[in-house]
């Protein structure tokens, strides 16, 4: 198993999907460490957005790691990558308000993601979606599976 400074090196590929935006959604993640691979997916039958599903994929993948790790997280979402690497510090400083003083969308998930990231050393890598990257294609297929399962689940009453 690859390690750095005693920490496991993990490659994560994430993706989110949504039908209707808002509508039912799904997320998927592929975690690779050494010779091991783990796939995660899930969905939301109620009204959600593609951005919420992208965030959820990253959160679930990072929360699945059982110990602090060195992570390379690959995403096709510029919203996710820019949010966590650039915008989040300002949002936190402004009390989770945008520069226009409006509430940050998905603040609940951004805060959860920030907590999940704190345990790890994470490098955020953007990949072009639907361009043949094997990890992204697999994460996309898992997100589609999560969406399909969410469509078959009745929304909460």
Curated annotation (Swiss-Prot):
Pfam families membership: RNase_H
Keywords attached to this entry: Cytoplasm, Endonuclease, Hydrolase, Magnesium, Metal-binding, Nuclease
Keyword Cytoplasm included in the entry's annotation: yes
Purpose: Endonuclease that specifically degrades the RNA of RNA-DNA hybrids.
Residues annotated for Mg(2+) 2 binding in this entry: 15, 140
InterPro entries from the UniProt entry: RNase_H, RNaseH-like_sf, RNaseH_domain, RNaseH_sf, RNaseHI
Organism: Frankia alni (strain DSM 45986 / CECT 9034 / ACN14a)
Phylogenetic placement of the source organism: Bacteria, Bacillati, Actinomycetota, Actinomycetes, Frankiales
Protein name: Ribonuclease H
NCBIfam families linked: PRK00203.1
Gene: rnhA
């Amino acid at each position: 198993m690859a390690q750095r400074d005693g920490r496991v090196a993990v490659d994560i590929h994430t993706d989110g999907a949504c039908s209707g935006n808002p509508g039912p959604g799904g997320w998927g993640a592929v975690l690779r460490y050494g010779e091991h691979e783990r796939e995660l997916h899930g969905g939301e039958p109620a009204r959600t957005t593609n951005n919420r599903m992208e965030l959820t994929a990253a959160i679930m993948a990072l929360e699945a790691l059982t110990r602090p790790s060195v992570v390379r997280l690959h995403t096709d979402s510029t919203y996710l990558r820019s949010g966590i690497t650039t915008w989040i510090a300002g949002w936190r400083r402004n009390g989770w308000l945008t520069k226009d003083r409006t509430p940050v969308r998905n603040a609940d998930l951004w805060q959860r993601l920030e907590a999940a990231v704190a345990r790890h050393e994470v490098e955020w890598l953007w990949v072009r979606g639907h361009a043949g990257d094997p990890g992204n294609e697999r994460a996309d297929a898992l997100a589609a599976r999560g969406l399909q399962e969410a469509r078959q689940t009745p929304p909460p009453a």
